[in-house]
């Protein structure tokens, strides 16, 4: 990943708490009621049941934060927003997604996924775009054509993503608005 590329980095906890703690019919996406000093930062709360949920601290910035930043954000969210002081962490996850168009590792090989430009720079989403790349490659193979993998984003979409990420980099305080 080139230096200075915006990154989406996150830590998530699957937590278990007392009955009726979470509403399993209500997911909370991109809750900005958290520390914004390091970049665009938000919390996800994805309940699996009334006792279990994935709480994830996600940050968009060019530099990773220390692990205790994410842990403090999740703990603070559970205490202040969920009104929860007692919980058990059943699983932890973390990851980093580069938000930009990455060059292929080997131009002689068709790249799929991040290496093939599947990550949407503005969001970090890739799953459905990887699926499109695979469908494209399979259709070429089935029809006897050389293996090819298309970039699933238009030039216009990538241009708009570059503008969005430039604004996030220069003015992260505007993100919650």
Task: Tell where the protein language model's regions lie, with residue ranges.
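Short FAD-binding loop at a beta-strand-to-alpha-helix junction that anchors the flavin cofactor
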Residues: 45, 50-52, 106-122
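C-terminal helical "tail/cap" subdomain of flavin- and related membrane-associated enzymes
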Residues: 135-177
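FAD-binding beta-loop-beta segment adjacent to the flavin cofactor pocket
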Residues: 35-40, 94-112, 121, 164-175
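An active-site-proximal "capping" alpha-helix that borders the catalytic cofactor pocket
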Residues: 72-79, 126-145
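AAA+ P-loop NTPase domains with strong preference for DNA replication initiators
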Residues: 108, 127, 131, 149-154
